[in-house]
């Protein structure tokens, strides 16, 4: 029996990989509802390795390249790509962004309008990453938990993990046992605006704080992008909320009539290089530091965990990144 502390994104992904390889798995989760204790409930759900490469290391591509197909096995994935835009005064940001990544094509005003008619006449140039995708994080976590349960994994909700477990996936709650793990605050808002029709992730570039908007269906959109070095998990600040709402209005003036149906803030666990790690401490393996790349990198990291805990099933063609 392999025991796991934490039934958030990382813990469930690891349980899925382990159970698929024939392991008996039990997960302990302090929250009484799937996803309630996970910072992933505030995530954008973008499966966007090439966009993330602009501000991250090469590993976001090498580790995140298979995430779309992995998630498509357990939940709905929208393969609509990502459109990166900038207001006229920040047009140089498009060139800067393009220099730091690949797998895009430049599109002009008419092409932007063809991709997203709601943006017609609003932007004259953009980058289109047609291989990227997005998902609904909360639905994805529920679907992953259902898939894990169907494989025979026991999920013990409302239960503290015992003192010794095989795998620790508790995110920022494990900071006391991982010396260089730090919290990075992220904030978001969910808007309801059925008048605006947008079908794919939009990234709005800005020199100080680039933001993203992700469609959730039924006229709902998630907007986020803040990254604040902070230990505070208090509600979203007025400054951050105003910046998010101004960004939505910049994308489309129709958002001026949007209802703000939810706001939230959470603490993402991150190491100094903002990449996830495996760390062995006695009999416990830690997976942590998914930062803002949880849905993108959790599948590959879960495969590494399964290779470590079930070495007899290891795929030798899978390149591991392990840091002890």
Model feature map: region roles:
Residues 2-26:
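N-terminal Rossmann-like FAD-binding beta1-loop-alpha1 element of flavoenzymes
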Residues 16-17, 47, 76-78, 172-282:
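Active-site substrate-recognition segment that forms the wall
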Residues 20-39:
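Glycine-rich FAD pyrophosphate-binding loop
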